[in-house]
């Protein structure tokens, strides 16, 4: 799978800033064990009980256009921050892709090497971490 592709335009003509394609994030030492259970629509508790893995995000697809303001709302523990941390590859994506606009080229951060990730983190993605 290529780490770059031509930037797609949003419906209103703007370029896309970030694209999440069927993103799945699982925490634990054997995340692949959870995937078939996720596909069978088992609950987060059932997956953790059977595999010891913790489901963070299941099958999320979302596109954010350049200049768009997007709010992710949900209950505590629903995966909002987990999904956002995938933008700069701080959380591992076990299935799916996260594409980030790097000056006109979409970079798949799930497949990017360390040098590319460093560039994306320094010049394309800004993140303010939540405080408790």
Q: Which residue stretches match the model-derived regions?
A:
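The feature captures the beta-strand-to-loop junction immediately N-terminal to the Walker
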Residues: 73-75
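Conserved beta-strand
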Residues: 20-23, 47-48, 52-65, 96
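Conserved ABC transporter NBD signature motif
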Residues: 96-108
């Amino acid at each position: 799978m290529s780490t770059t592709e031509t930037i797609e335009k949003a419906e209103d003509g703007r370029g896309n800033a970030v694209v999440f394609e069927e993103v799945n994030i699982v925490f634990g030492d054997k995340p692949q064990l959870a995937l078939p259970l996720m596909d069978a629509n088992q609950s987060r508790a059932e997956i953790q009980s059977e595999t010891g893995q913790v489901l963070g995000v299941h099958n999320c697809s979302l596109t954010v256009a350049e200049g768009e303001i997007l709010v992710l709302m949900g209950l505590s523990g629903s995966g909002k921050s987990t999904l956002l941390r995938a933008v700069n590859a701080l959380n591992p994506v076990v299935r799916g892709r996260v594409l980030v606009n790097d000056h006109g080229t979409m970079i798949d951060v799930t497949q990017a090497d360390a040098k590319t990730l460093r560039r994306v983190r320094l010049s394309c993605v800004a993140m303010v971490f939540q405080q408790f």
